[in-house]
Amino acid sequence: MAKVLVVYHSGTGNTKAMAQAVAEGVKEVPGVEVVLKEADQVSVSDLVNADAVAFGSPTYFSYMAGVIKAIFDKAYLSRSQLKGKPFGAFASGGGGEVKSVQSIENIAASCGLYKVCEGVAVGGMPTESDSQDCRKLGTTLAKASKK
């Protein structure tokens, strides 16, 4: 069974709500398991063992949270094992969340991961429309994980 790892950090609960919506989207695809983990609980082996990964972060100074960046720092030496693995990104914030998504996408690509969908950037608490975008991200990743 294919596995999608949803990694997130959330300070206020907004990014957690987005992560849960991404996980719901993954569950819509038969034959795919979803693993939802807070960033400080994620190891490099979690990334290597997943068939696809979603990264979610709050926005700090138009950038991803340090705990998300730390995952990439640890994973960089294992990038050969991550090469071509599908990923997607999502972020929440009170400004700069598009840049936060872009920062995740850029560093994930440098670790060899392959972007399969547009990131989701949300200002504040996700609306139903935002949650739908997150579910779509999850569904897209789930389908990509089976290839």
Locate each region found by the language model.
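FMN-binding flavodoxin-like domain, especially the glycine-rich phosphate-binding loop
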Residues: 2-4, 14-17, 21-31, 35-45, ...
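Short polar catalytic/cofactor-binding loops
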Residues: 9-13
